[in-house]
Amino acid sequence: MATNKSIKSVVICVLILGLVLEQVQVEGKSCCKNTTGRNCYNACHFAGGSRPVCATACGCKIISGPTCPRDYPKLNLLPESGEPNATEYCTIGCRTSVCDNMDNVSRGQEMKFDMGLCSNACARFCNDGDVIQSVEA
């Protein structure tokens, strides 16, 4: 019985991460002025809102090229972005809400491996695909 719960939990987490990681594809075509606008846009779009509606509601722009305008910086890890802690907070929030729920299901060796994969997925999501390797013993 516990094995079925573990499998169900892992499957649900994989599905949720799949949905979250799919949003990264969309994020590259929207630019927001600040973290609040980016979070608003992501939440709106994740809830099913269309890109143009979410962009208008959150003060963001939809672009066709790969570069955001200067007054609409993209959330990233560059020091000049002015928001270096935003990525760290994103990663912490993702790990807390998604990965910790997986950890509560089972504490076996396989789950530790899955937790590592979940943490890496959160890092990729929050860093817009640029993964910074963590040093963990």
UniProtKB/Swiss-Prot annotation:
> What does the UniProt keyword field contain?
Disulfide bond, Plant defense, Secreted, Signal, Toxin
GO terms of biological process kind: defense response
The places in or outside the cell where this protein is found are: Secreted
Question: Is this entry keyworded Signal?
Answer: yes
- Answer whether the UniProt record assigns the keyword Secreted to this protein: yes
List the disulfide bonds in this chain: 31-68, 32-60, 40-58, 44-54
- Described purpose of this protein according to its UniProt entry: Thionins are small plant proteins which are toxic to animal cells. They seem to exert their toxic effect at the level of the cell membrane. Their precise function is not known.
* Family designation: Belongs to the plant thionin (TC 1.C.44) family. 4 C-C subfamily.
Name by which UniProt lists this protein:
Probable leaf thionin
User: Organism source for this protein?
Assistant: Hordeum vulgare
Starting at the broadest rank, the lineage of the source organism is: Eukaryota, Viridiplantae, Streptophyta, Embryophyta, Tracheophyta
